[in-house]
């Protein structure tokens, strides 16, 4: 796993993935609290 992707840094991928996961969890809990998540 020592080979880097070259164009895209690994920390950038981790940061974007983390923000996306946190955003999806936030939207899911917000929908659950507002009653929109009950249909999922």
UniProtKB/Swiss-Prot annotation:
It is found in: Plastid, Chloroplast thylakoid membrane. It is a single-pass membrane protein. It comes from the Eukaryota. The chain crosses the membrane at residues 8-28. One of its GO terms (cellular component) is chloroplast thylakoid membrane. Belongs to the PsbJ family. One of the components of the core complex of photosystem II (PSII). PSII is a light-driven water:plastoquinone oxidoreductase that uses light energy to abstract electrons from H(2)O, generating O(2) and a proton gradient subsequently used for ATP formation. It consists of a core antenna complex that captures photons, and an electron transfer chain that converts photonic excitation into a charge separation. This is Photosystem II reaction center protein J. It comes from Oryza sativa subsp. japonica. The gene is psbJ.
């Amino acid at each position: 796993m020592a080979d880097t992707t070259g164009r895209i840094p690994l920390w950038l991928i981790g940061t974007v993935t983390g923000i996306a996961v946190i955003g999806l969890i936030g939207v899911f809990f917000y929908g659950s609290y507002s009653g929109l998540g009950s249909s999922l």
